[in-house]
Structure formats: C-alpha cells, structure tokens
Amino acid sequence: MPNAHDVLFRTLADPTRRAIFERLCREGEQTVGALTARAKVSQPAVSKHLGVLKQAGLVRDRHEGRQTHYSAQLRALAPLIDWTSQMAGFWQSRFDQLEDLLKRMDQ
C-alpha cells in the first residue's frame, strides 16, 4: 500500500490536476463549471481530475442544489511538507560535510 506522500506526489504529478488544485488554493471554492471554463479540458475530464484529487484528500466537495462546489484541503499537504523538511535536513547535513571536507583539503 502506498504511503501518503507517494499518493500526493502521484496525484499532483499530472499538470492539469495540479493546475486545478492550484486554482482552488489561490481562488477558493469553485464549481465544476467555473473550473471547466478556464481549463483546457472537457467537463468530464475536470470531474475525473477532481475525483482523483478528492480521493487523495486534496479537495472537498459540497453540494448545493444541482451544483457541486470544490475547495482545496491544504492540511492534506502535511505529509509532503514533512517529507520535504526531512529531505532538506538530510541534504543540508551532506552539504555541511562536503564543505568541511573541502576546507580540510585546502589546508
């Protein structure tokens, strides 16, 4: 079973899906129709992408009459933030070790 950050990376790897998610982050809640109007794909494609985003926990839907509104769930990015922080710490440590080695080589 894939871990949380693998699911998020896989979900956000698609440029169209990532653009939809970014738009929801920047502009707030949107209907499928509003998202489709600015997307370069059909309404069924937008709906499919929203389904994948929802399954990954990145968006939430809210039904109002015949319309479905979607909003970004930024808390779902926590596993990516944690992973990125771990990797940043790992590489910073490696760069510090390399810097120490280069200083010793110059002496």
Where do the model's predicted regions map?
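Generic structural signal for conserved hydrophobic packing positions in ordered secondary structure
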Residues: 17, 46-49, 91
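Alpha-helical residues within the helix-turn-helix
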Residues: 37, 48, 54-55
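Conserved segment of winged-helix/HTH DNA-binding domains
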Residues: 72-103
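Generic C-terminal helix-cap and adjacent flexible tail
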Residues: 3, 103-107
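N-terminal helix-turn-helix DNA-binding core of bacterial DNA-binding proteins
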Residues: 2-44, 64-82
